[in-house]
């Protein structure tokens, strides 16, 4: 549990990119002091991340992993009810709460396509504790001040599963408002 809370705290910090340094901002890929960012290490075998000595935690990880591949990436909104409660709570400021609202919003951006065996997004880790599953991703984005420059950052999605149904009941991520673009930063690099 301690590992989860530390990673969640670090994740929120990593996703907020607002450091200013004397003399200007360092280029993408560097810390505020000008040191190179540590390279992100993605999982070589995403399915290995689903393992747990606790069968409930393994099931929770698999449900979130399958939801992501089938519904979010695959665009199969007709299957959302298999994975999400009707009362799904959304903490992303760009999507309303409720399964139907998720389907309407995300479905517009993700037409159905073949479901991949693993996530098309590069996963760093999947961590589960109690009814919470957190997925850590590597993600490319353009620098806000220098759009021609691209850097890699971490992204975190946290899901709470309903104790009775075992389905996704709540979601958090570190998203800001998407603005006039109508899509998240880095969406052009989404697989």
Task: Cite the ranges covered by each PLM segment.
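Positively charged n-region of N-terminal signal peptides that target proteins for export
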Residues: 1-4
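Bacterial N-terminal signal peptides
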Residues: 7-15
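Short, low-complexity N-terminal intrinsically disordered segments enriched in polar/charged residues
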Residues: 19-78, 82, 86, 189-191
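A solvent-exposed, acidic/Ser-Thr-rich amphipathic alpha-helical stretch
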Residues: 77-133
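Short beta-strand segments enriched in hydrophobic/aromatic residues
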Residues: 84, 139-141, 174-175
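Beta-strand residues in well-ordered beta-sheet regions across diverse protein folds
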Residues: 91, 136, 169-172
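Exposed beta-sheet edge and beta->alpha loop/turn motif
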Residues: 136-165
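Short beta-strand edge/turn micro-motifs at domain boundaries
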Residues: 154-188
């Amino acid at each position: 549990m301690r590992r989860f809370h530390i990673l969640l705290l670090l994740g929120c910090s990593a996703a907020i990119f607002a450091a200013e340094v004397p003399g200007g901002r360092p280029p993408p890929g560097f810390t505020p002091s000008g040191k190179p960012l540590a390279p992100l290490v993605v999982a070589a075998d995403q399915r290995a991340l689903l393992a747990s000595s606790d069968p409930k935690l393994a099931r929770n990880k698999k449900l979130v992993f399958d939801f992501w591949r089938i519904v979010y990436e695959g665009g199969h909104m007709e299957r959302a009810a298999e994975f999400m409660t009707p009362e799904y709570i959304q903490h992303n400021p760009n999507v309303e709460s409720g399964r139907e609202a998720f389907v309407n919003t995300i479905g517009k951006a993700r037409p159905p396509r073949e479901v991949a065996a693993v996530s098309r997004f590069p996963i760093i880790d999947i961590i589960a504790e109690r009814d919470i599953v957190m997925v850590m991703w590597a993600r490319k984005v353009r620098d806000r001040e220098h759009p021609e420059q691209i850097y890699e950052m971490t992204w975190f999605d946290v899901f709470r599963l309903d104790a009775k149904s075992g389905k996704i009941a709540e979601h958090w991520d570190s998203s800001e408002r998407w603005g006039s673009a109508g899509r998240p930063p880095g969406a052009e690099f989404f697989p």
